[in-house]
Amino acid sequence: MEMALQKQEQILCKALHTDLGKSKTEMMCEIGLVQGEIRWMKQHLGRLCRTKHVRTPLAQFAAKSYQSPSPYGNVLIMSPWNYPVLLTLEPLVDAIAAGNTAVVKPSAYAPASANVLKDLLEECFPPEYVAVVLGGREENQALLQEKFDKIFFHRKCSGRKAGHGKCCKTSDARDTGTWRKKPMHCRKKQ
């Protein structure tokens, strides 16, 4: 994905300028943050996936306890219009690194960026690992009717209220308003 992102950087910049009128500096910052996330994940993935020794409860004093990270499963990423590249690709990098499959729904309010992202992701990943859905509110509603193990959406996302309601009803894990919580690190409370 890192090489494909570098290869399509100019096309992405044109799309960001077409959709949002972003300056070259702002575009490079958005793309650079994604490239930085990819490099960071490549460096630290081994440590993040390692089995960790944890405290054993007193009742099982003779045993040893470990915690092993495991993927959630299928992740839905609904990105907003204001940072279409960053808030689509950064959670995707984390979801893929964690071993999840993903359905990516770029914003309909940034159509040029959404089309470039679709081409980029289809070039990088087979459709059984990463699927891209283009469209508006109808597609958002249809996606939210499906079962996902993790849903990422942002406050600026048009499907925010519906997505938040869906997450609360089904107890899906969710990230809203921040991309600091990664699909690999967050756990649902039992």
Q: For each predicted feature, which ranges?
A:
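Conserved small-residue-rich beta-alpha loop and adjacent elements
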Residues: 56-128, 171
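Conserved NAD(P)+-binding/catalytic subdomain of aldehyde/semialdehyde dehydrogenases
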Residues: 74, 124-190
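Residue-level recognition of specific faces of alpha-helices
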Residues: 30, 37, 74-77, 174
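Short alpha-helical
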Residues: 7, 11, 22, 33, ...
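Short secondary-structure transition/capping segments
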Residues: 37, 115-117, 187-189
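Short loop or secondary-structure boundary microenvironments that flank
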Residues: 28-31, 81, 106-108, 134, ...
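N-terminal Rossmann-like NAD(P)+-binding subdomain of aldehyde/semialdehyde dehydrogenases
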Residues: 1-66
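Alpha-helical structural signal in soluble globular domains
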Residues: 2-4, 15, 35-42, 120-124, ...
